[in-house]
Amino acid sequence: QVTNNKINEPQTIDTQLLKFDSDTLHARPMSWPDYTLASLPYKGIDYGEFEVLNNSKRILSQPGTVTIEFFFDDLKRGNYRFEVRTQVGDEEIYKARDFSVKSPHYPSLRTPRELAAPLVYLMRKDDHEELMAISDLKHQKLAVDRFWLSNIKNTTKALQVIELYYERVEEANKQFSNYKEGWKTDMGMMYILFGPPWYIENTLEQKIWRYSNDFYNPETNFTFKSYKFKNKFYPFDNFQLLRNQQYFSLEYRQIQKWLSGSILRDNI
C-alpha cells in the first residue's frame, strides 16, 4: 500500500525481485569438521550473489492511497527478496521482504525423489548418489523400498520403521525449515536420527538438546550454535551442530539401529 501526498508531484515506485545463491546441501555427518566461515553452508545465503528476475516501475500521478499487488508465477525452489523503493521529498524509502520457495506440497513428501533424498543419513555416499541418479520415478521408488527391505528383513517391522523415519522427516520440515528444507538442517538431521530431545536448554546464541538426565555425557547432549548475520532482512534461524570426531561411533550405532529396526525399541 502506497500513499502519494503530493497534489502536483507524481510518485515513482521501483520494485525488483532478486534470487540469491543459497545452500541446498543436506547436513554433513556429526563427526566431520564444522563448516568454515566462508563456506555457503555456514552462511546459508550469499547475499553478494544474486539474479534479478523482475523489475518494474509504477508512477502514481494522482494523490491518494493505492494498493499494488504483485504476482510471480512458477518461482523455482530457492531464496528470494522483493524490494520496493520510492522517494518522499529528499528521503528514499526502502522496504524488503525475504522469502523461501519450496515444493508445492511441502512439508509433506510425495514423490519418489523426495522419499529417496533423506535416506542420505542412512546410506553410504556412493549408494545414495546411485539412488538419486535414477531418472525413472517408478524404478526409484522400487529402489527405495528395496533399500528398506534388504536391511530389515521383516516386512511388518520394516513398514513401522519406514513410517517412523518419514514422520520424523516431515516433522523436521515443520520445525526446522529455514532457507532450505528442515530435514537438511543440522537440527533436522539430529531430530530424524535421534528423535525429539528430552530437554532443550536455550540461551541467546545456542541450544542444547539433552537426551538423558546426565548433562555431562557427550553422547546424549548436543549443542547447536546460532550464527547471526548483519542483515536485518535475514528471516531465518540458522543453528548448526558443534561437531566432534568422537561422534563417529555414536552416529554409526544410531544408523545401525535404523537399519536393523531396533530403533523401534531403543531410540538412543
Q: What positions do the PLM features span?
A:
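Long, intrinsically disordered, low-complexity segments
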Residues: 237-249
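A short tyrosine-centered beta-strand micro-motif
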Residues: 78-85
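A cross-family detector of function-defining hotspots
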Residues: 136, 148-159, 165-168, 173-179, ...
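Contiguous beta-strand segments within globular domains
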Residues: 1-12
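Short beta-strand elements
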Residues: 12-22, 79, 90-121
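Surface-exposed, short loops/turns at beta-strand junctions within beta-sandwich domains
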Residues: 72-78
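Aromatic sugar-binding surface patches on proteins
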Residues: 26, 33-69
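Early exported N-terminus immediately downstream of N-terminal targeting peptides
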Residues: 108-162
